[in-house]
């Protein structure tokens, strides 16, 4: 069973990780087509972001030899492509934070209180300055990870740093934008509230922030820190 599969019922072919034996060294992958005997979908799950996720169930599904994509030991090779996927997640999270920031900027320039525009209040000016610092710093980390990956030098550590920075910046700036805009930002007539909901999901999807912090720490100390139970 696989619980969370984004828009799972819309796909016709599924890449499925399988175990050929115990341990990560025996993980590979196969291709399973929609409609195969024993392969069914569970009830759709609605998430905060508005997306639909579907559980997948595999009950003695037969996989022919020509549908085996990677045999035992192929998991590590396939995970190498995850750096690129995480960069995409990172860029989308940052883009949503930037959209919310820009919407709040326009609101602060046009919305007036006590006889002047919101942007003229020093307290709000500092909020916008902090938001820009977060977004611009995260963007540079994203560019570093993407540029090196495009040059054939992907770095899991650089990608992890960029994802954590962009996920945080995107969510925090969307949250701050709603606070600045008040009801106008909280309303579903505005896309800013969607930015908040969506960026919250990116902090989990594609590698939870806590998992990536472990990866960053391994780079700091140049050591592997197994998080599972100790081997006897």
Residues covered by each model-derived region:
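Alpha-helical interface subdomain recognition
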Residues: 57-60, 72, 80-232
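Flexible, small-/acidic-enriched active-site or ligand-binding loops
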Residues: 34-62
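Exposed loop/turn and edge beta-strand positions of beta-sandwich/beta-sheet ligand-binding modules
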Residues: 12, 52, 160
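A short core secondary-structure module
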Residues: 1-40
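Active-site PLP-lysine loop of aminotransferase-like
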Residues: 2, 47-48, 86, 163
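Short, charged, solvent-exposed linker or helix-capping segments at domain edges/interfaces
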Residues: 28-29, 40-43, 64-72, 230
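Basic, amphipathic alpha-helical recognition segments used for DNA target recognition
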Residues: 32-36, 67, 98
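Active-site beta-strand/loop segments that form the cofactor-binding cradle
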Residues: 1-10, 20, 44, 61, ...
């Amino acid at each position: 069973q696989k619980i969370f599969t984004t828009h799972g019922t819309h796909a016709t072919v599924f890449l499925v990780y399988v175990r050929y034996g115990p341990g990560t060294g025996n993980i590979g992958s196969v291709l399973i087509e929609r409609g195969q005997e024993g392969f069914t979908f569970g009830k759709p799950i609605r998430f905060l972001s508005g997306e639909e996720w579907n559980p997948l169930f595999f009950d003695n599904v037969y996989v022919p030899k020509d549908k085996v994509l990677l045999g035992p030991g192929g998991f590590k090779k396939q995970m190498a492509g995850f750096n690129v996927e995480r960069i995409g997640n990172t860029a989308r999270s940052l883009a949503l934070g930037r959209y919310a920031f820009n919407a709040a900027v326009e609101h602060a320039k046009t919305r007036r209180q006590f006889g002047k525009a919101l942007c003229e209040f020093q307290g709000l000016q500092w909020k916008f300055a902090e938001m820009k610092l977060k977004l611009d710093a995260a963007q540079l980390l994203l560019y570093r990870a993407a540029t090196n990956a495009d040059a054939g030098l992907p770095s899991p550590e650089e990608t992890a740093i960029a994802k954590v920075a962009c996920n945080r910046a995107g969510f925090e700036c969307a949250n701050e934008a709603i606070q600045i805009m008040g009801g106008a930002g909280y309303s579903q007539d505005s896309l800013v509230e969607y930015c908040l909901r969506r960026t919250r999901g990116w902090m989990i999807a594609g590698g939870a922030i806590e998992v990536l912090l472990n990866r960053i720490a391994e780079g700091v100390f140049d050591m592997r820190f197994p998080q599972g139970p100790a081997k006897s």
